């Protein structure tokens, strides 16, 4: 992930009693590259305090051209409070100014969406304006199809397409496994971690859970969707494991933020974040199709599909990986883990037919 945008806050109170209090926000980009369509984040209680917000009052955020920008109140995922996020674009080494004040916000088109899909055996599928993802639920498990991994849907439209693709597929109008102009699902998951999920790693073996049991939407647009998934207990070697995943996707981002929590009857686990390599000889092709860096990156280029192109997949752990290797048909990044801790990282990908031509 990129370095964090720096935010400075200045509260402006006019001497005129009839003028609303305003909160001046400066977003600075200290990096050497432009940061376009990213999220700035501020504690909501800070805004409430500075603007003396009362119950039922709304705010607006304006840029330096006095245009409103979209925003969203989001949770901290641990229910410790709320933050405010808003879209910002800042050139390298520059800063942008915004103003927060009371007012009536414009209606902005949602850029993220997700839902449980009971009509497709309890899939849970979510998307932003660049990609879509899904995981598999209890109704599919009841048919005998078990998968603990994350699927990737390749999109070349900024439209939100989940409902349309499911409706057309179930009505046998058009399959979302074929490209009808907006993209398709041609990523292969099966009984694997799919794109960048994490599992206990015991005796050099991935220990996979089953399909999710419950799915709870925590944040629901227009800029961020966050879902909490719970799973039935399973074993990693002799240890009983209870797993929770919280997955969050922002507008414009290629990456989900993933927070895994594993409860276990031990003080230390080994865990592996993995990207499935759906080939017969993963060890032999790893040198030309993978990229790994112990500072925290694993990446894998899927085999080229002559009709549909290539998916470039990656997982990024901000604190790095102890070991990176091919194991159990996956490219994995391995770390020690203390049960009960939050294991935070990012997982996502890009599609060659949507302008993502290589890992650069």
Annotate each predicted stretch with a short phrase.
Residues 172-251:
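Extended, loop-rich substrate-binding clefts of extracytoplasmic carbohydrate-active enzymes
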């Amino acid at each position: 992930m990129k370095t964090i945008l720096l935010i400075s806050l200045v509260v402006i109170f006019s001497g005129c009693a009839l003028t609303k209090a305003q909160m001046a926000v400066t977003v600075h980009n200290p990096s050497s590259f432009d940061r376009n369509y990213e999220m700035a984040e501020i504690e909501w209680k800070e805004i409430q305090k500075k603007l003396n917000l009362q119950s039922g009052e709304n705010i607006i955020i304006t840029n330096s051209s006095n245009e409103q920008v979209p925003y969203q109140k989001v949770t901290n995922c641990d229910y410790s409070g709320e933050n405010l996020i808003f879209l910002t674009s800042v050139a390298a080494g520059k800063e942008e100014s915004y103003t927060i004040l009371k007012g009536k916000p414009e209606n902005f088109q949602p850029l993220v969406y997700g839902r449980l899909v009971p009509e497709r055996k309890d899939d849970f599928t979510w998307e932003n304006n660049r990609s879509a993802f899904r995981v598999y639920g209890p109704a599919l498990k009841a048919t005998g199809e078990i998968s603990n991994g994350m699927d990737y849907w390749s999109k070349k439209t900024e439209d939100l397409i989940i409902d349309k693709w499911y409706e057309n597929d179930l009505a046998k109008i058009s399959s979302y496994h074929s490209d009808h102009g907006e993209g398709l699902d041609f990523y292969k998951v099966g009984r694997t971690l799919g794109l960048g999920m994490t599992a206990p790693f015991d005796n050099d073996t991935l220990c996979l859970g089953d399909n999710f049991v419950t799915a709870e939407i925590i944040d629901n647009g227009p800029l961020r969707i966050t879902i909490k998934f719970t799973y039935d207990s399973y074993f990693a070697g002799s240890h009983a494991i209870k797993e929770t995943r919280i997955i969050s996707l922002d507008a414009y981002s290629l990456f989900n933020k993933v927070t895994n929590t594993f409860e276990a009857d031990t003080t230390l686990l080994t865990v592996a974040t993995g990207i499935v390599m759906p080939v017969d000889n993963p060890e032999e092709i790893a040198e030309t199709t993978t990229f790994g860096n112990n500072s925290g990156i694993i990446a894998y280029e899927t085999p080229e599909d002559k009709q549909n192109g290539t998916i470039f997949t990656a997982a990024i752990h901000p604190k790095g990986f102890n070991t990176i290797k091919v194991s159990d048909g996956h490219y994995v990044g391995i770390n020690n883990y203390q049960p009960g801790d939050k294991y935070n990282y990012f997982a996502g990908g890009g599609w060659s037919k949507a302008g993502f031509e290589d890992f650069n």
